[in-house]
Design a protein with these regions (language model features):
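Helix-coil boundary and interhelical linker segments in multi-pass alpha-helical membrane proteins
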Residues: 1-9, 67-84, 115-122, 155-168
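N-terminal signal-anchor transmembrane alpha helix
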Residues: 1-27
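Hydrophobic alpha-helical transmembrane segments
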Residues: 4-9, 54-55, 82-87, 111, ...
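C-terminal ends of transmembrane helices
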Residues: 19-22, 92-102, 129-136, 181-185
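Cytosolic, membrane-interface loops and tails of multi-pass inner-membrane proteins
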Residues: 22-54, 185-202
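Interfacial segments of multi-pass membrane proteins
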Residues: 45-49, 72-75, 88, 92, ...
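Multi-pass membrane catalytic core of lipid/isoprenoid biosynthesis enzymes
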Residues: 46-73
């Protein structure tokens, strides 16, 4: 029962579309009608050009899955229950009940969940994203690389004892690939939008 409760709690918390809400409150309207149509951090930056809204969206999207995992771990005294809650948080972000199950791609939520459940893996995944972004300037490629390497990081540090994390992170990496289908196609065709680090934002 603790697993089901944690999964549902994580899902409903993850379903809160912070990027959409923040953009509405800031006067930008429905972010789903602009840019890539996504409700996540990258599209918030693309549409608003505001670092404050982008950073807040990143923190809240990462935090909701991470918080769900930490709270479930604390309440039930089980790391595996916390892992399930974190998974629920990512699923909620990707398939929010409030938006007809049409949500984001779950990168920030996944990284937040990893930081909460297996900190060393979360840190390495974040660093991987940064390095890839600096080298190739593709947000999607950076995310896919970071999340795909996470299961290997978990196994490298935990061995057989880390199998629950390896499986969970592998599932999230696969989910991310599915959510990034259009990005992968654009990468292959050389049409993916690059991150412009030189462009000034407010």
């Amino acid at each position: 029962m603790s697993y089901l409760i944690s999964l549902l709690f994580g899902y409903f918390l993850g379903s809160v579309p912070f990027g959409l809400v923040l953009c509405y409150l800031a006067g930008y309207g429905d972010i789903r009608k602009s840019g890539s149509g996504n409700i996540g951090t990258t599209n918030v930056l693309r549409v608003t050009k505001r670092k404050d809204l982008t950073l807040l969206t990143l923190i809240l999207d990462a935090g909701k899955a991470g918080f769900a995992a930490l709270l479930a771990t604390y309440l039930f005294g089980s790391a595996s229950v916390g892992l399930v809650a974190g998974l629920g948080g990512v699923l909620g972000h990707n398939f929010p009940i409030w938006l007809n199950f049409k949500g984001g791609k779950g990168v920030a939520s996944t990284l937040g969940m990893m930081l909460a459940t297996y900190p060393v893996v979360g840190v390495l995944a974040c660093l991987t994203w940064v390095v890839m972004a600096l080298l190739f300037k593709y947000s999607s490629l950076s995310a896919l690389t970071a999340l795909s390497l996470a299961p290997f990081y978990a196994y490298a540090f935990g061995g057989a004892a880390a199998y629950p994390y390896v499986l969970a992170f592998a599932f999230l990496a696969l989910l991310s690939m599915i959510r990034h289908r259009a990005n992968i196609e654009r990468l292959i065709n050389g049409q993916e939008t690059k991150i412009n680090f030189k462009k000034k934002v407010k």
